[in-house]
Amino acid sequence: RGLGDVYKRQAQGLIDADQLGWDNPAQVPLREMANVPMRHLKTMVEFELGTIAATALTVDGLKACHVGNGNKWQAIIEPSTPGFRVSVTVNNTVSTTEVSAAASPTDGVFLADYRYTVPLVLNGSELTLGTIGVGSWDEGAGGTAQGMTPTHYRIEGLENRTIEVYLAGSDSPTQITLDAKGEAMQQAGVPVGIVARIACDGTQYEIGREESSQISLRIVDGKVAFREADDKGFIPVNTIAELKMIDLDNASRGRKYLQQGNIDLLDAEWTPISKLEGIYDGSNFTVARLRVSLGNGNAGLFAANGGTIRNVVIASASALRGQWHAGMVCGENTGTIERCTNRASVTDGGSNTLGGICGYNNNGTISECLNTGTLTIDATVPSDGTGGIVGYCGKGTITGCGNTGGIGGKPSKTGGIAGQADDCQIADCYNTGDLVLPWGAGDNNGGIAGLTYNATLITRCYNTGTVTVEGSQAGGICGQLNAGATISSCYNAGKVGAKWNSGGIAGQSTDAEIIACHNDGLIESQTSGWAGAGGICGFHKGTITACYHIGQVTGDSAIGAIVGEHNSGNISYCYWNGDLEGIPAGGGGSQTGNEKFGAAWPQPSTHEAWRTTAETPAAYWRTLGSAGGGYPKLAWEK
């Protein structure tokens, strides 16, 4: 019904809102907007100002959201009375008008689920005619306004065509007609759905985008083509179809790409992009519902990377399995991966390597990446490594990365950062996730790395997660440290346990070096009899210098505050507290200057490895503490 009366308010400015009349407004049902859980009278208002080039528009003092092109604006308001105030800025001049109405619902004020389209008459030097559309929603439980932002389609090549829009899980399309620019606006439904695909003249194009978003495509001769690159040479990507285009040919794989929105892969079988040679920047938008289950070649969003992948976020995945290497971001990396995140949890049934970010880092660089997902190995074949960041690292670097996700199942060579490291540099990384592996799991598991050798260096890393395994060689930092490998300036504060050979820093060390590290965590044997459990190392055949232990060590025999068994090599200038011997008698190795806290305290003059940054900027320690004044702190440690 019409509102009947005309409400007039006078406003000052270049444009005088002399009359705002509501006379027999068209009431158009907006069922696609209904049932949004909003408070009563929370209202969406659309303003179309015709030819006036408004530079700003506010509603009740709130900045309106500019949508579309030209003069179309949209705002969400919550008036305290049945009315609202509109301010329009044109040529730096502000004009304000108020709209009010009687509070009686019989007058038809702000009826739920309806949009009111009324004429807006603006008198002044610039006369135009536009519309105000008001859509309001009934009283609900409160919450966010799902579905309020419309989907904006911009499809070059389908101008003036009608397209069919299919939501995920539905075979009933909605028809939308694009204008002469290939554009259309569609109000999103509630709850927000995923646009799975669109079709035109029988040809379908994969989308994978949430409603209430910008969906852009370029169609040439009925096929998807890349859109124009930006001023930095990056080609925009915001749909499944465009993502698949990267693997079109060698030239495509060498270009630069910029992800423009969240992409949902719809849990359909994904064929990994074979090898990126250019740059892919995910812009911290997400990729969801990744599924690679066929077990062929490498598995991941990318099969291999020889270029640069950055700012990619894997939000979820249902399967990840490769014949060789599996990683959420990529299977094998020979290039650079930086600032990427995996949140997905998966179970792998047979890949040789599995990583939260990358399966096999082959002389590549991985930096500032994070895994929060749980990785589970459910396989009867041996694994070459499972890690929160990387399964296997060979002659590469991993810096500034973290893992908070758990690792379970029956893997071997497992690490919070890297499962296996061969001549790999791991620096400034941390693990807080738990590695809890049952009977039947393999050996060599550590908070940072599982198995290391050949000039591998682990430095400035820490672990606070639990590392327990029914097998052998468990360490807070590394499970097994082999010939040529070094751990320096690291600490463990997590619980560590194994059937044999468990240590706060390393479960076993053979012809390797541990220097300037400390353990604060509980070390325990998971069996009776010979344990090989130590605060720094369980079974030792290498070199340990300037380390200390202040945690606990439990077990039947072959246990010590520094090492469980000192088979060979040298241990020097290490300290501990508690009732245990630092180094049990009977081993074949040598030792120098090892003391219990209280009997002695480390000093810079004790050994050069105990120098502090006050004397030597590159020293391992920031402070050495004192009896009753705290224990030594590493240079980087808080």
Residue ranges and their predicted role:
Residues 1, 72-84, 179-195, 201:
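Short Pro-Gly-centered beta-turn/loop motif in secreted/extracellular proteins
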Residues 8-23, 90-96, 195-212:
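A short, solvent-exposed loop/turn motif at the edges and junctions
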Residues 22, 26-82:
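Short helix-loop boundary/capping segments
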Residues 63-71, 169-183:
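Short, acidic Ser/Thr/Gly-rich low-complexity loop/linker segments typical of extracellular
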